[in-house]
Every structure is written in C-alpha cells, then in structure tokens.
Amino acid sequence: MEGNFLNNPWINCCFVTTYAGVVAQYFKKGAEWFNFTTPSIGTFTNEQNEEDSSNYSTSGYDSSAETISANSSPINRSGVRSRISQKQRQRILKEAHFKAQQLNRKMVVQKSCPPDHEIKPVPSKFYQFDAITDFGFGGPVLLVGMQKDVEVMKLETKEKARSGRKKNRKSKYKCNMYKMTKLAQIVAKIPKKKEVIEIDEDGFQKVSSKKAAKLRTLKPADVPTPPTKVVENKEEVIKLEVIEQPEPIVLPVSTPTVTFSRFEEMKRVVKVEKAQESAKTKALKKSKAISISRHVGFLQILEKLEETEEKPQVENEKKVVVKHVQSARKNQKKGRKNRKVEPPKEEFEPYEEDHYNFKRYFLIIGVYVLVFIYVCTNVLTVGVSYEFPYITLANKNVRAINSTLPKSVNESSFLIR
C-alpha cells in the first residue's frame, strides 16, 4: 500500500459513493454542490494545477438531481436523434483521436532528456484515485481519473523512400500513343542485319535457302541496266473526216402533202425499209463509215430522214453525226467504254379495222365450210341429191338388208342414187 489508501486498486465505486454521502450529511447541505462523475478519458481540464490534480475532466456522469429532470425522461427527449451513420461515426472517432494526441502532448512532463531521445506517454495498468483538498464550498471535492506515466524513449528516425516525379495523368488514348511511339523508337534503334543480295546475269536475285528471300528495292547503281532502244512516240493525229452519204434512192412512193407527226413518219419509213435494204448495203460498203459499226444506227436514221425531209435538214443531221464521231474518237483515245447505239426497233403497223373484220369473217366462213364437207363425206355418198334426209333413211334400210345377204352380192347396186 502506497501513501494514500485511495490509491488501492481494489477500492470500488460503492465505497466512494458511501463516503461521499457521509460527507454530504456531515455538512448538512444538499447534494447539489457535489458531482460524482465517471472519467471521460482524454479530456484535459486543469492546466494550472498539474501536480495536484490528474488534469482530467469529470463532467460526464451526474449523480445529482439533474438526472431526474424532464429533459432526461424518455417522453420529453425531443433532441435525441436516431443512430448516426458510419461516415459520421468515423469522423467523430477521427476527431477524438486527434484531440487525444494533443492532450497527450500537453500532459507530458518536460524532463531533461538527451538530444537523441524522445518523451512518450505510456498508460498505467489501473485506475488511480486522487483526493484533492480544495475548499471551494467549504468542503473537499473528489476527482476520479486515470493518470498516464511518461517514459523517455530513444528517437528513431527513418528515411522515407522518395517517389519519383509525378507525371500528369493522360487519357487512355494518349497513353497508348505514347507507348506505341516509344516502342517504335526502340525498334528503330535496334540494328538490322544486312542481307547480301546476289543478282544473276539475267537480273534475278539468287535464293540459297529454301525460303524465298524478300525482294528489296535496289539502288540504281547495283541494278544491271539492259540495253534499251529509244523509240520516239509520234503523236497520233486524228483527222476528222466528213462521212460521205450515198445519194438517196427515190422510190415510186406517193409522198403526202399533209405534215405527219413523228410516229406516223416512222411508220411510213418502216414500210419502205425492206425495199431500201439492198440499196443501203451497197452504199455502205462504198462509204468510209462502215468501219465505225457503233454508229450504224445513226446512219440509218439519217437515211430515213433524207427520204422524208428536205436536204438542208439532212445537212444539219450530218453535222450532228460528225460531232458524235469526233467525241467518240476522243473517248476511245482516253480509253473509255462507249455504249453501243442500237438501231431503232421496227414498229409494225397495226391492222386497220376493215381488214381485221374481213379476215375474221373469212375465217369463220371457212370453218363452217370445212365442217359441212366433213359431214357430207361421212353421212352421204357420192352423187347425193338435195333431199338428203330421206335418202339417208333409205340407205340405212338397204344396208340392213345387205347385212343378211351373202358377201358376193354387191352392196352398191341396192343403194338409191
């Protein structure tokens, strides 16, 4: 046992409360002036009296009449909140830990220590009760708290590993581009083995291994230059020749004086076309335009227009054909594909109503005649008179008689003529 009996760790709260009650009755004053509290560890109260007091606050637990107040009742407890969240709890614990560290620094007694040492607080193993004789109200005040011991520890300094220079964050695309460029630079620095290229007399590369070597672009000095013949490319001069059209063949066709539409005009041309075919082939063989086969359709249209229109109009059409031939030759020189101009399709003239009706009636009459002839050949014999119904009946009777007679008798002798 140390100096004061209150330092005994086995003294419990029951003894302290009874002791406080006896003291209160002795002074005959109510318990309002006396506050018995549980120690709130880590809260510093008295900075002046460091030697006498334990420097801990005792304002956490009240044994006075305030505990029976209306605020502490569960009904009138309007300020009580629900359970705090995890974030709030973590923040409160962090703040409490920070305050505890500050208090520990203040509680440390400045003792003489060597320069390489440091003073660190170490908590005691049990609660230590201290009775302080302060007569604020004419009587003693009991403070209960925990005291912390202080030890001198050797200072250990550890050098922190310094990290490299921080780079600015880049986007994923830029990072990949940076890597690609870096790899390309590294690959470019790697020296490549130069392959010896051997060339034959014919100018081909020799391949020694099984795998064919990759052909590379050789310098002009290394490549053997075969003898070349310089040929001057003469520019092709195309002379546009006017196509000589054959003289129009005049046929004995009655030219109408009335102006026709284009459709009627084409119908009339189609009628004359067969008569002109023989003359056209002879004329085309003589002309120079037979070599350009794709423009035969235009020439045929020209010849058809010659028959119907006057000569000045034909000359205008000739100029159009010449221009078309010129453009076709230019396109042929450039290498473009020209579409073949197909000749106009023959449009047959439909039958007129009178001719159509006449043929229809003629066919119907012919069918009736054929049916009549067929009936006559099967029912009547040769040389039938106009009264054929009666004769047919008589002939049937005669045939019935002949069927009973022998075959030697001639059947035709009994027929009615």
From Swiss-Prot:
Any GO CC annotation of this UniProt entry: membrane
Keywords, sorted A to Z: Membrane, Transmembrane, Transmembrane helix
Polar residues composition bias: residue spans: 65-76
Compartments where located: Membrane
UniProt feature coiled coil, ranges: none
Composition bias type Basic residues, residue spans: 326-339
Keyword Nucleotide-binding annotated: no
Keyword Transmembrane: yes
Origin superkingdom: Eukaryota
Membrane topology recorded in Swiss-Prot or TrEMBL: Single-pass membrane protein
Organism: Caenorhabditis elegans
Chain segments carrying region Disordered: 44-83, 325-346
Protein name: Uncharacterized protein B0310.3
Biased composition (Low complexity): 54-64
Classification lineage: Eukaryota, Metazoa, Ecdysozoa, Nematoda, Chromadorea
Sequence intervals crossing the membrane: 362-382
